[in-house]
Amino acid sequence: MYWRDRRKKSSSLWASCRALGYVFAGLSLALLLSDLAVRSEPADQFENLTGKLLVATPEMGDPRFAESVIYVVKHNSEGAFGLVINRPIAKGPVGDLLKGFGVESKDAKGEIIIHYGGPVSQNQGFLLHSDDVLLEDSTKVKDGIAMTSDPKLIEAIAHGKGPRQYLFMLGYAGWAPGQLEGEIHAAAWFVVSSDKSLVFGQEAEKKWHQAIDKRQIPL
């Protein structure tokens, strides 16, 4: 379900991505949680965090996640999978993005922003989007938000037929069983409810502060 880069070098967008060290590779979404190599001690039972936001606290010790806001796409006994929603890294014509996937799309219009989705497998692409448009492989998450990893949805966006709200990411954040719970217990993250206005807001630099304003008692 991951998008595959054909290694075409025709776009300035991909040139800027390559400068940041990002390329694409094809892998199976079913392996996301099972491939997490690091295992943690089981933590106390936490509520399911699917569809919620993880907000890095000032005590976050990992600089890769400093002031990050992560949308949790999946959280279960096998671990957790999420996407950083406040780290744009590049912008370019959506037609160039499609060419990078080997998709020739005539009359593709508009530009698209590429976001850093997390430090794991930064060669993998994802669309987090409103669920008004869904494909066969789309995953409905919660509260009107879905995730898709099919370039056909990018093509639909390029022709004005895509979802009303979306973010395109490279990479993801992944946790082994008990790992995320341990980090929350260590006060690296706190958890807040999500809403589409925050997730898909255009001012990425404000999202962390907006999430801070939504702060609840840590789970």
Question: Where would I find each of the regions flagged by the language model?
Answer:
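A short aromatic-anchored loop/beta-hairpin motif
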Residues: 2, 21, 30-33, 37-219
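Bacterial N-terminal signal peptides that target proteins for export
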Residues: 6-24
